[in-house]
Amino acid sequence: SFWSYFQNTYLCDSPNYNCRKTNLDIFSCRSEREFYDAFASAVLKQTSSKLEEWMENARLFLSRISPKISLGTEPMTDFSISLELNPKAADVDDILQLPEKIAQKKGIDIVVCIDEFQQIAEFKDSKAFQKRLRSVWQLQKSVSYCLFGSKKHLMNELFEKKSLPFYKFGDTVYLPKIGTEDWVDYICGRFEATGKHISAELAGKICRA
Protein backbone atom coordinates (compact mmCIF):
# COMPACT_ATOMS: atom_id res chain seq x y z
CA SER A 1 0.00 0.00 0.00
CA PHE A 2 0.92 3.64 -0.47
CA TRP A 3 -0.30 6.87 0.98
CA SER A 4 0.17 10.59 0.71
CA TYR A 5 -0.78 12.75 3.65
CA PHE A 6 -1.23 16.43 4.28
CA GLN A 7 -0.50 18.22 7.58
CA ASN A 8 0.23 16.61 10.97
CA THR A 9 -2.11 13.62 11.04
CA TYR A 10 -0.14 11.80 13.76
CA LEU A 11 -1.37 14.26 16.38
CA CYS A 12 -4.69 12.38 16.52
CA ASP A 13 -2.96 9.60 18.42
CA SER A 14 -2.22 11.91 21.35
CA PRO A 15 -4.77 11.58 24.18
CA ASN A 16 -4.49 15.31 24.85
CA TYR A 17 -5.23 16.33 21.28
CA ASN A 18 -8.86 17.03 20.34
CA CYS A 19 -9.04 15.29 17.00
CA ARG A 20 -11.52 13.09 15.17
CA LYS A 21 -10.77 10.62 12.38
CA THR A 22 -13.06 9.94 9.44
CA ASN A 23 -12.44 6.82 7.34
CA LEU A 24 -13.73 6.40 3.80
CA ASP A 25 -13.14 3.70 1.17
CA ILE A 26 -13.94 4.85 -2.37
CA PHE A 27 -13.12 1.59 -4.17
CA SER A 28 -16.77 1.21 -5.24
CA CYS A 29 -17.14 4.85 -6.35
CA ARG A 30 -17.37 5.10 -10.11
CA SER A 31 -18.23 8.76 -10.53
CA GLU A 32 -17.76 12.20 -9.02
CA ARG A 33 -21.31 12.12 -7.70
CA GLU A 34 -20.82 8.78 -5.95
CA PHE A 35 -17.69 10.20 -4.34
CA TYR A 36 -19.59 13.21 -2.97
CA ASP A 37 -22.36 10.97 -1.57
CA ALA A 38 -19.83 8.69 0.15
CA PHE A 39 -17.73 11.63 1.39
CA ALA A 40 -20.69 13.44 2.97
CA SER A 41 -22.07 10.24 4.54
CA ALA A 42 -18.71 9.31 6.10
CA VAL A 43 -18.03 12.79 7.47
CA LEU A 44 -21.51 13.19 8.98
CA LYS A 45 -21.58 9.68 10.44
CA GLN A 46 -18.11 9.68 11.98
CA THR A 47 -18.06 13.20 13.41
CA SER A 48 -21.39 12.94 15.23
CA SER A 49 -22.18 11.06 18.42
CA LYS A 50 -25.96 11.00 18.06
CA LEU A 51 -28.62 11.00 15.37
CA GLU A 52 -29.86 14.50 16.08
CA GLU A 53 -26.36 15.93 15.74
CA TRP A 54 -25.58 14.61 12.28
CA MET A 55 -29.06 15.54 11.03
CA GLU A 56 -28.51 19.06 12.33
CA ASN A 57 -25.13 19.24 10.59
CA ALA A 58 -26.70 18.06 7.33
CA ARG A 59 -29.39 20.71 7.66
CA LEU A 60 -26.92 23.48 8.52
CA PHE A 61 -24.15 22.78 6.05
CA LEU A 62 -25.86 20.98 3.14
CA SER A 63 -29.15 22.86 2.99
CA ARG A 64 -28.56 24.22 -0.52
CA ILE A 65 -28.10 20.70 -1.86
CA SER A 66 -31.30 19.14 -0.46
CA PRO A 67 -29.76 15.92 0.85
CA LYS A 68 -31.97 12.82 0.88
CA ILE A 69 -31.19 10.68 3.92
CA SER A 70 -32.14 7.00 4.09
CA LEU A 71 -32.15 5.37 7.54
CA GLY A 72 -31.60 1.69 8.30
CA THR A 73 -32.40 -0.31 11.43
CA GLU A 74 -29.52 1.35 13.30
CA PRO A 75 -29.78 5.08 12.45
CA MET A 76 -26.42 6.02 13.94
CA THR A 77 -24.46 3.55 11.82
CA ASP A 78 -26.80 2.47 9.04
CA PHE A 79 -27.72 5.40 6.85
CA SER A 80 -26.86 6.78 3.45
CA ILE A 81 -27.06 10.17 1.79
CA SER A 82 -28.08 10.97 -1.76
CA LEU A 83 -27.30 14.52 -2.84
CA GLU A 84 -29.36 16.50 -5.32
CA LEU A 85 -26.35 18.09 -6.96
CA ASN A 86 -26.52 21.10 -9.21
CA PRO A 87 -23.69 22.01 -11.56
CA LYS A 88 -22.93 25.10 -9.47
CA ALA A 89 -19.45 25.05 -8.00
CA ALA A 90 -20.78 26.47 -4.72
CA ASP A 91 -22.93 23.38 -4.15
CA VAL A 92 -19.97 21.04 -4.58
CA ASP A 93 -17.81 23.25 -2.37
CA ASP A 94 -20.41 22.88 0.40
CA ILE A 95 -19.73 19.13 0.39
CA LEU A 96 -15.95 19.44 0.29
CA GLN A 97 -16.05 22.06 3.05
CA LEU A 98 -18.25 19.88 5.28
CA PRO A 99 -15.43 18.53 7.51
CA GLU A 100 -13.90 22.01 7.88
CA LYS A 101 -17.24 23.52 8.92
CA ILE A 102 -17.94 20.72 11.40
CA ALA A 103 -14.41 21.01 12.83
CA GLN A 104 -14.83 24.74 13.37
CA LYS A 105 -18.27 24.29 14.90
CA LYS A 106 -17.05 21.63 17.37
CA GLY A 107 -13.67 23.24 18.05
CA ILE A 108 -11.74 20.16 16.94
CA ASP A 109 -9.39 19.03 14.20
CA ILE A 110 -10.42 16.30 11.76
CA VAL A 111 -8.33 13.84 9.76
CA VAL A 112 -10.11 12.45 6.71
CA CYS A 113 -8.60 9.11 5.63
CA ILE A 114 -9.56 8.07 2.10
CA ASP A 115 -8.64 4.56 0.97
CA GLU A 116 -8.22 3.48 -2.68
CA PHE A 117 -7.78 7.12 -3.63
CA GLN A 118 -6.42 6.14 -7.05
CA GLN A 119 -10.04 5.49 -8.09
CA ILE A 120 -10.51 9.20 -8.81
CA ALA A 121 -8.30 8.82 -11.88
CA GLU A 122 -11.10 6.73 -13.44
CA PHE A 123 -13.77 9.41 -13.06
CA LYS A 124 -15.04 11.32 -16.06
CA ASP A 125 -13.22 14.66 -16.37
CA SER A 126 -10.89 13.45 -13.62
CA LYS A 127 -8.40 16.28 -13.94
CA ALA A 128 -11.08 18.92 -13.37
CA PHE A 129 -12.34 16.92 -10.38
CA GLN A 130 -8.83 16.73 -8.94
CA LYS A 131 -8.41 20.49 -9.35
CA ARG A 132 -11.62 21.07 -7.43
CA LEU A 133 -10.56 18.81 -4.57
CA ARG A 134 -7.16 20.39 -4.20
CA SER A 135 -8.39 23.98 -4.52
CA VAL A 136 -10.74 23.46 -1.56
CA TRP A 137 -8.70 21.10 0.61
CA GLN A 138 -5.43 23.04 0.53
CA LEU A 139 -7.05 26.07 2.16
CA GLN A 140 -8.62 24.22 5.08
CA LYS A 141 -7.08 24.94 8.48
CA SER A 142 -8.73 22.35 10.73
CA VAL A 143 -8.74 19.31 8.44
CA SER A 144 -5.91 17.05 7.25
CA TYR A 145 -6.14 14.41 4.56
CA CYS A 146 -4.53 10.97 4.59
CA LEU A 147 -4.88 9.48 1.12
CA PHE A 148 -4.24 5.76 0.73
CA GLY A 149 -3.98 3.58 -2.36
CA SER A 150 -3.15 -0.02 -3.23
CA LYS A 151 -2.07 0.68 -6.83
CA LYS A 152 1.41 2.13 -6.45
CA HIS A 153 1.88 3.19 -10.08
CA LEU A 154 -1.45 5.03 -10.16
CA MET A 155 -0.79 6.79 -6.87
CA ASN A 156 2.67 7.76 -8.09
CA GLU A 157 1.14 9.34 -11.15
CA LEU A 158 -1.43 11.29 -9.14
CA PHE A 159 1.14 12.79 -6.76
CA GLU A 160 4.37 12.87 -8.76
CA LYS A 161 3.26 13.95 -12.23
CA LYS A 162 3.82 17.70 -12.59
CA SER A 163 0.85 18.21 -14.90
CA LEU A 164 -1.68 16.84 -12.40
CA PRO A 165 -3.34 18.91 -9.65
CA PHE A 166 -2.20 16.76 -6.70
CA TYR A 167 1.48 17.09 -7.59
CA LYS A 168 3.41 17.46 -4.30
CA PHE A 169 0.17 17.83 -2.35
CA GLY A 170 1.73 16.30 0.75
CA ASP A 171 4.40 14.00 2.11
CA THR A 172 4.58 10.54 0.58
CA VAL A 173 5.08 7.33 2.54
CA TYR A 174 5.58 3.87 1.05
CA LEU A 175 4.54 1.00 3.29
CA PRO A 176 6.48 -2.29 3.14
CA LYS A 177 4.65 -5.55 2.61
CA ILE A 178 3.18 -7.04 5.76
CA GLY A 179 5.10 -10.14 6.84
CA THR A 180 3.40 -13.55 6.79
CA GLU A 181 3.89 -14.01 10.53
CA ASP A 182 2.09 -10.74 11.26
CA TRP A 183 -0.74 -11.71 8.90
CA VAL A 184 -1.12 -15.09 10.60
CA ASP A 185 -1.31 -13.46 14.04
CA TYR A 186 -3.90 -10.99 12.76
CA ILE A 187 -6.08 -13.63 11.09
CA CYS A 188 -6.00 -15.90 14.15
CA GLY A 189 -6.81 -12.94 16.39
CA ARG A 190 -9.80 -11.89 14.29
CA PHE A 191 -11.18 -15.43 14.36
CA GLU A 192 -10.81 -15.57 18.15
CA ALA A 193 -12.55 -12.20 18.50
CA THR A 194 -15.68 -13.76 16.97
CA GLY A 195 -15.50 -16.91 19.10
CA LYS A 196 -14.05 -19.07 16.32
CA HIS A 197 -10.73 -20.82 15.84
CA ILE A 198 -8.35 -21.21 12.94
CA SER A 199 -4.98 -22.94 13.08
CA ALA A 200 -1.80 -21.02 12.31
CA GLU A 201 -1.12 -23.49 9.49
CA LEU A 202 -4.44 -22.77 7.78
CA ALA A 203 -4.05 -19.02 8.32
CA GLY A 204 -0.65 -19.27 6.64
CA LYS A 205 -2.24 -20.96 3.62
CA ILE A 206 -4.72 -18.09 3.37
CA CYS A 207 -1.83 -15.61 3.33
CA ARG A 208 -0.08 -17.48 0.53
CA ALA A 209 -3.21 -17.95 -1.58
Language-model regions, residue ranges each:
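Conserved Walker B catalytic segment
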Residues: 81-151, 160
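P-loop NTPase nucleotide-binding core
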Residues: 1-110
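Conserved nucleotide-binding/hydrolysis micro-motifs of P-loop NTPases
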Residues: 27-31, 117-119, 150-154, 178-181
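A short helix-turn-beta junction within AAA+ P-loop NTPase domains corresponding to the substrate/partner-engaging
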Residues: 17-19, 159-177
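Active-site catalytic pocket residues across diverse enzymes, especially alpha/beta-hydrolases
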Residues: 10-14, 137-140, 162-163
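A short helix-loop-helix "switch/interaction" segment in the helical subdomain of ASCE P-loop NTPases
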Residues: 201-209
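C-terminal alpha-helical "lid" subdomain
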Residues: 101, 105-109, 192-197, 204
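Conserved small helical "lid"/interfacial subdomain of P-loop NTPases
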Residues: 175-202
